[in-house]
Amino acid sequence: MKKIVEMTHDIMRNYTKSKGIAVDFTMGNGYDTLFLAQQDFAKVIAFDIQEESLMRTKALLQKEKQLAKVNLICDGHENLDAYVSAFDVGIFNFGYLPQTDKCVTTKLATSKIAVEKALACLAVHGVLLLVLYPGHEEGKKEADYFLEKAKALPSKQFAICHIALMNKKQAPSILVIERQAKG
């Protein structure tokens, strides 16, 4: 079976638009940002609150010669509306920056705000992916909240799919939200 990152990339690849905008709401080590930059998007925007994430991502993008169309933002994803008014593809990889302090994680309080704003900015026929990690305390809160929240989204506006390993209780999962129509 493919790894979560491969699955998310396969899904996002299907939504690439040559004049579109993609957003990585949780930059981390920059692998999703790099993937989006390598696609046919006109612009890629990536957020993280940790300067270390920006430095790692910038180095990765420079090494791969993909920095030109990417805007790296050191700010919380809950402030996305100061930088983004609309986008076609977006991804949240909730949790913590690998190989760093696991106490610094995304928080449900700010993640709720960010996802709400992202849904408002998501273009018709665009997709928003939420990668949920219930294996740590804050991640469990986020997973529980977003799985319930997704059920309440209007079906005339959104199509929603949850991809999960059924026999691994704390395995990461992907919530795929496609906008069908404006509300």
What are these regions (language model features)?
Residues 1-20, 31, 55-85:
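S-adenosyl-L-methionine
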Residues 24:
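Class I SAM-dependent methyltransferase core
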Residues 94-114:
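Mobile active-site "lid"/loop adjacent to the S-adenosyl-L-methionine
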Residues 29-41:
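Conserved SAM-binding loop of SAM-dependent methyltransferases across substrates and taxa
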Residues 43-48:
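Conserved SAM-binding motif I beta-strand of class I
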Residues 139-183:
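Class I S-adenosyl-L-methionine
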Residues 121, 125-132:
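Conserved beta-strand signature within the Rossmann-like core of class I S-adenosyl-L-methionine
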